[in-house]
């Protein structure tokens, strides 16, 4: 559907947005996010994420330069929604991605509202998420989320900006993810999410919900 190199199914869209950030950011880090977000995501970023020590700096996405102005040495990602709920003001994917890439900052986008219609990876996004509850499921019968890795972001080129993927991970035997995955392809981000964040936090998608979402994709 999205043309990524790997994906991770989780228990909800909220789990997908949280894990997408926590995979590369820790206490003392920050992300710059569009202020035009689904209310649940906005609250997650403003309150629980802040309580964990990850600062979320909200900016008006109508001017992409706002992302650059809010960036500092501890910024780990940019975040936006392709078609925000409820405003539906189109997010400037290409412009924001172009600001972040030279700095080693990936753009993470929520494409829940526009599967098939929009291909964020073609416009420079590095990672995307969906609440699979919506169009992927299609029937409102199941709750789930998914994180998709484009494989198009060079995490290894920015070790200072992306230490989570470029320094030994004590939770996984000291693995350096960008090195460990080289025989497998450009999957450092999504493999780390699967083997550490999902393992430790536990928001796995139920097998029955996964079956329902596959049925939804088929129809």
Predicted regions and their residues:
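Glycine-rich phosphate-binding segment of PLP-dependent enzymes
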Residues: 1-2
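Conserved PLP-enzyme active-site core in the AAT-like
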Residues: 6-219
């Amino acid at each position: 559907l999205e043309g990524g190199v790997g994906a991770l199914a989780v228990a909800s869209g909220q789990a997908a947005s949280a894990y997408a950030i926590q995979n590369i950011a820790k206490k003392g880090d920050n992300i710059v996010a569009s202020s035009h977000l689904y209310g649940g995501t906005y609250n997650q970023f403003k309150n629980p994420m802040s309580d964990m020590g990850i600062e979320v700096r909200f900016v008006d996405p109508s001017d992409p330069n706002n992302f650059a102005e809010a960036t500092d040495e501890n910024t780990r990602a940019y975040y936006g929604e392709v078609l925000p709920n409820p405003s539906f003001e189109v997010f400037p994917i290409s412009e924001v991605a172009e600001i972040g890439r030279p700095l080693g900052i990936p753009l993470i986008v929520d494409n829940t509202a526009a599967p098939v219609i929009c291909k964020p990876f073609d416009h420079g996004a590095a990672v995307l998420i969906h609440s699979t509850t919506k169009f992927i499921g299609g029937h409102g019968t199941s709750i789930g989320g998914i994180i998709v890795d484009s494989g198009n972001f060079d995490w290894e080129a920015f070790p200072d900006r992306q230490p989570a993927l470029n320094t030994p991970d004590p939770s996984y035997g000291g693995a350096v993810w960008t090195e460990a995955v080289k025989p497998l392809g450009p999957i450092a981000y999504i493999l780390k999410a699967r083997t550490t964040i999902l393992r430790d936090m536990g928001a796995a998608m139920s097998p029955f919900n996964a079956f329902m979402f596959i049925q939804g994709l088929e129809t």
